[in-house]
Amino acid sequence: MKAAVINDPVDGFVTVKDVQLRDLKPDEALVDVEYCGLCHTDLHVAAGDFGEKPGTIIGHEGVGRVSKVAPGVTSLKVGDRVSIAWFFKGCGHCEYCLTGRETFCREVINAGYTADGAMAQQCIVPADYAVKVPEGLDPVEATSLTCAGVTMYKALKVAGIKPGQWVSIVGAGGLGNLGIQFAHNVFGAHVVAVDGNEDKLQAAKENGAEVLINRHDGDVDKQIQEKVGGVHAAVVTAVNASAFDQAVDSLRPDGKLVAVALPQGDMQLNIAKTVLDGIIVAGSLVGTRQDLAECFQFGAEGKVKPIVKTRKLDEINDMIQELKDNKVVGRNVVDFVHE
């Protein structure tokens, strides 16, 4: 099968090559991948930012049909459409797995990082961890919900945002665009979109953002304070440390910063402001299987609609460069159906 494999030596890019899959082990299923999106986390993995993984197949925004199951598998059957997500498998018995916080499992396995991922014609998955995709949901759109969508859905849950409150989505790309839709259409919030790209801001407006702020037009935090009196929550998807500092200063008292992006570096936090204004800072990491099932259902109901563009597998390094250059609106998705 054809797959996108991290280069050796690691250099931030991949090579499309033929790979032979191993046999299925107990509790596993084989998925014929239909589509797989390219996520910014794939860039981190390909560059070795989390530790070098040469030879690993990238991809954790995969959707496909089950073509084979190992003996004893009861959670899936041949023909089921399933997702291949970043949260690939947990231990199943730690305090996090047992209390609905499985993404924090210390023995977690991640698709496209510590296990071969979905940027390939086929992928082996742990059957009990492959969340089914509703038949009413476009599989191309489902790829974005598998990672970007559920990440933002969970982040807004963590933010505790309520109907009528203001939330800023900092970074209006693939993650941010879906976050805007979830905030507006599912949580009933008012949305401030922050980005430095006018095309992305226009897309944000079309998807429900009421206030648009171009970060090149001056201090983001001051603009937000002037326009809406500060936000109740800020969800940061922008991959630069300064965005986090600005987001904290854009909060109103008792506000909450939810960190989603993973830039290199540290975040500056004024202790006095944090205490006196009751500021809360929280990290949010993708979502659980239940979060993803809920996310898919909102997609099937038409409450969120990812911006997607299908590409060929041979274009994967061009896709990586475009994402590095901040030129992607929505998500680029590799089409394996017509490969």
Regions found by a protein language model. Give the residues of each.
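Residues in the short beta-alpha loop(s) of Rossmann-like NAD(P)-binding domains
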Residues: 197, 263, 287
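Glycine-rich beta-strand-centered segment in the early N-terminal region that forms part
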Residues: 22-36, 47-95, 129, 134-140
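C-terminal hydrophobic helical "lid"/dimerization subdomain
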Residues: 3, 245, 289-339
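Cysteine-cluster motifs in flexible loop/terminal segments that predominantly coordinate metals
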Residues: 39, 75-76, 86-131
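Glycine-rich cofactor phosphate-binding loops and adjacent beta1-alpha1 units
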Residues: 159-163, 201-280, 337-339
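Mid-domain Rossmann-like dinucleotide-binding core that forms the NAD(H)/NADP(H) cofactor-binding site
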Residues: 82, 128, 135-223
